Amino acid sequence: MTRRCSSFAIILTLTLGAGLALAQQSPAPQTDQPPPGKIIFSRDLNAPVEPQPTNPAAPPQSGSLAVTDAERSAIAFTAYDLDVHLTPASAAISVRASLTLRNDSAAPLTRLILQISSSLHWDAISTRTLPSGPTTPLPFAAHLIDTDADHTGRMTEAVVPLPQPLVPGASVTLTALYSGSIPPSAERLTRIGAPDDQALQSDWDSISPSLTALRGFGNVLWIPASSPPVFLGDGAKLFQSVGLARLRNSAATVRLRLAVEYTGDPPDAAFFCGLRQPLAAISDNANLPEAESPGVATALFDAQPLGFRSPSLFITDRPASQTGTPANPNLIAAVTDHYDALPAYAAAAALVEPLLTDWLGPQPLTSLTILDNPGQPFEDDALLVLPMRAVEPATLAPALAHSLAHAWIHSSRPWIDEGLAQFLSVLWTERTAGRAAALAELQDAARSLALAEPELPDSTLSPAGTSLATATTDVFYRTKAAAVWWMLRSIVGDDALKQALQTYRLDPRLDLDPIGLQRTLENSSHKDLRWFFDDWVYRDRGLPDLSIVSVTPSQLTSRTGLPAGWLVAVEIRNDGFAAAEVPVTVRSTSASETQRLRIPGRSSASTRIVFAGTPAEVQVNDGGVPETQSTTHTRQLLLPSH
């Protein structure tokens, strides 16, 4: 398959998460053998609870099985129940996955499409026709196809015929066995010309004794997916595909039973979908020296909502070091051997903590966990993977304001979760460099947003991925959302927004309500915000397009006939579809007067401002409201002579 890429540097910058891959390991075949006395993980195909077919699957073929992208896009995963067994010494993985799939297409499905990394292979797939009945083995064919959704640049795709068609809206549960190895690989980048070292800075997913890092769809297909092939050189389609998959599967539940083989010191903890569980170690032979003693470490992650993420798994080999501030001494848990970096992170946390406590409340909900790993960063709420180094606290503070926001407030809604964290980063800029610097930051971000927004948005609910409530790309759920938070601050005021945020974060029921945030803000501000949420959150109206139609200054006189200032009438046109509430400012050389004005989409509005001095200029919008073109509009005044 032919693919074109104009610049590897651009692709490397865009790659999903990233970092330096771990040292190359040669995978060797290995049979899973739990320690005697306790079964930690079993793939017994004759097990009475879930009997599986004993005939091994044929190896995947490179030829096409004539699968359509419509078939690949037809299903949503609504439940993952995973038994995962890892052997880090050989990068080996074997999985028993119970998958509940729903037909989200408009037509019945006669077969299902399941995909895993090309370094893995399907062993068996079965289903139950009755809830309490025996499992029925399903025949399937597997082939290899190119895709950059996996770091190897390929995936193993299984085509599974169904005993009977799956009608639209119906669900089916399959049990799939698959295995293989996940060593470091950056094949998708090196085959388009990337130097090995730079490629491995981006694609660092692997299973190894020092760190197991599996970031999921878009990086490594370690659990089954179903999506059309996408490529890094084809615009932003890979990243859009990742976002759509996250949205489609966000309501799923995930459960994991994990077993990790080890020799010597056991691994310390596992992080699944951003949550931590300690690993309980069971030694296979206590009579051997500790450095030679094999064992199995286990962890259980109970069923939980997946949310807007690709399921990820990290396993660390050492306990975290705690650091923080006097008020929150365990604010940061860092798994690192760069202990000299801890004081810098503690000092940076102390710098941004007053901002976070002022806006969100005195105590975080969780610690921020940092896994020290060379390469580009990866973030999943309050889990951060990045290279830790001893640098100036002021250098760390802007990014830490964003990351620590995830420790203070959690939301299942990406535009709240990520947008609010980005908004707090802008507030940090305002607090340290001034309002003009914060507005300049917003204006820079608005340029990329203007390119992404449609010129003629639909007047009804937008398709998933464009309205902020269902956004799937970061230009919306992070960039646009930060601007939305800034505008809400301008509309309701700091105190009302702080009160709403502190109420919202402590009541999970509000996050479950699609309009819970709107109601909370309306209660704290005593303002009707439906117009704003309709145009900026629930629908995608695009961006405003403002212009100054006219400015009419009229001199005022006192009762004695002496000049008493000016009345400046300003008419503003909005040629965009989204309503905007913007500041309208009249200035002289020494003073200014500002009023806020709401201009509905495709409409005009006017205001009159009384100005005590001699007006010289009118400005509409200060850069805080993103627009399709310029985000500030000025007009110099020519005063009438008397």
Mark where each language-model region is.
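N-terminal, polar/Ser/Thr-rich
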Residues: 24-94, 530
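A surface-exposed beta-strand-loop module
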Residues: 40, 120-203, 243-249, 291-292, ...
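Solvent-exposed beta-hairpin/edge-strand motifs
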Residues: 109-143, 263-265, 587-594
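Beta-strand-rich binding/interaction modules
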Residues: 123-126, 265-273, 552-621
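Extended, low-hydrophobicity, Ser/Thr/Pro/Gly-biased non-transmembrane segments
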Residues: 174-311
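Juxtacatalytic substrate-recognition/specificity segment
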Residues: 297, 318-416, 420, 424, ...
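Amphipathic alpha-helical substructures
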Residues: 364, 474-558
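Acidic/His/Gly-enriched intrinsically disordered linker/tail segments
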Residues: 418-492, 507-509
